[in-house]
């Protein structure tokens, strides 16, 4: 076992005939180090490993910051005194820059649910309809209740069955069955409109192409809020720019790390 913390994780040490060793199955960078923890040279290796870890860019943290930051948008022609609740769940972990910017560009206020915690998870457990559904789906129920406590006017959670994809395989266009179907589950299991008198907007979208998305979004916004197609299309363009900025910043950060690895 690894002796460098109280966990004493098991690891595999392969020793070669030339005296070299190779460590595998270690849980962290400390597990790669061999030797007595009391030895000064070993302690120095541990300190170097810790320093290296702290200097390594945390791309997951950066992605989360970029996902939920505010992107630029022009002032809407008409401010709408409606707060749209967006739960930090499922596909929103890919599309949040688009949706927050889209709603703000149309003059709506936005309220996100808090980041997931054990309390949020436990708050929604009573509404989970299946023990076998994935953990991210179980979290949705708690996030809805979190938005209700925040006093939102409406909750928006679209059911998007198909999206365009960077992957050229035709099957990659279809969303995960749970992701695209869970808004329907929520409407029946939690029933926000009946339970909390909060409209739960879960429009069904089939976005095979950009044109489909634009047409369906303009139709939905005109029917639900009386917003003109021209105004919605303008908001879509602004939201697209925000989403592009999100991806561009992630690509730049990833490339910087790869360039550093290649250089070293």
Annotated model-derived regions:
Residues 1-264:
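An N-terminal assembly and electron-transfer interface module characteristic of large anaerobic redox
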């Amino acid at each position: 076992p690894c002796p460098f913390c109280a966990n004493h994780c098991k690891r595999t040490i392969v020793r070669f005939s030339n005296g070299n060793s190779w460590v595998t199955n270690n849980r962290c960078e400390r597990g790669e180090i061999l030797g007595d923890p009391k030895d000064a040279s070993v302690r120095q290796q541990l300190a170097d490993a810790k320093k290296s870890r702290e200097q390594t860019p945390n791309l997951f943290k950066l992605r989360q910051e970029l996902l939920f930051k505010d992107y630029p948008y022009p002032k809407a022609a008409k401010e709408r005194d409606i707060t749209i609740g967006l739960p930090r769940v499922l596909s929103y972990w890919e599309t949040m820059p688009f949706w927050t910017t889209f709603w703000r560009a149309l003059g709506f206020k936005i309220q996100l649910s808090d980041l997931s915690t054990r309390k949020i998870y436990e708050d929604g457990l009573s509404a989970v309809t299946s023990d076998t559904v994935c953990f991210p789906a179980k979290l949705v129920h708690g996030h809805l209740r979190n938005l209700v406590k925040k006093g939102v006017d409406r909750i928006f959670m679209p059911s998007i069955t198909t999206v365009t994809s960077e992957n050229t395989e035709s099957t990659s266009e279809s969303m995960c069955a749970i992701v695209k179907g869970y808004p329907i589950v929520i409407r029946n299991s939690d029933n926000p409109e009946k339970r909390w008198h909060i409209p739960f907007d879960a429009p069904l979208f089939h976005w095979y192409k950009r044109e489909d998305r634009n047409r369906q979004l303009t139709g939905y916004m005109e029917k639900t809020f009386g917003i003109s197609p021209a105004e919605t299309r303008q908001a879509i363009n602004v939201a697209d720019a925000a989403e592009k900025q999100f991806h561009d910043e992630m690509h730049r950060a990833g490339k910087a790390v790869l360039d550093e690895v290649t250089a070293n």
